[in-house]
Amino acid sequence: MCSSDLVDLDTSTNDTLIIMASGLAGNPEITEENADYDAFVAALTAIAEHMCAEHAGDGEGATHLITCEVTHAPDLKTARAVSRSVVCSNLFKAAVFGRDANWGRILCAIGYTPGDFSIDKVCVWLSSKAGEVYVCENAAYHPYSEDEAAKVLAEHDILVKVDMGTGDASAKAWGCDLTYDYVKINGDYRT
């Protein structure tokens, strides 16, 4: 899922991706029955995910790109809603900016997400190229080093891994942190 509101829950009229085919090249049409279909879908998905991540990481004043990968959700709708809820949580976005591994804010965002799942089975990891910390096991604190967590959260690209523990569905969403500069940029903006 990618939409421009993953930066601040407001949709911009300027962010659009349009894919068109005129047929003028004379290539055979790609349909679900065509052997090229799976390769086309995989390539298009990779491009769309890359553009979505680039867009989210380029939010006003952003210093971190946040990716949330949800696994073992009961269904795709819930997996998508949970991943989006985490990256859109202003409290969690501010925690990332402050390099605070505040797993309670992640759990809060998951908890207010509509869906039929057991919050008691949720496990959460925070990772980046600096390492990984396991911060929440079965909706409770999992011991971790604050110093290690701060190192993980000092990197630009932050991955939040959420294991719902209830099914086979998965989804991914992207967002960015919430910074002082975001407020300044948008507070100073005049139309």
Residue ranges of model-derived segments:
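Flexible glycine-/small-residue-rich
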Residues: 20-21, 70-72, 126, 162-164
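Short, small-residue-biased leader/transition segments that mark boundaries at the very start
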Residues: 1-3
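Short gly/pro-enriched beta-turn/loop segments at secondary-structure junctions
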Residues: 12-15, 61-65, 119
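Internal helix-turn-beta structural module
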Residues: 81, 88-191
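Active-site-proximal loop/short-helix segments
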Residues: 14-22
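A glycine- and small/hydrophobic-rich beta-loop-beta segment
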Residues: 22-98
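Active-site-adjacent loop/helix surface patches within enzyme catalytic domains
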Residues: 6
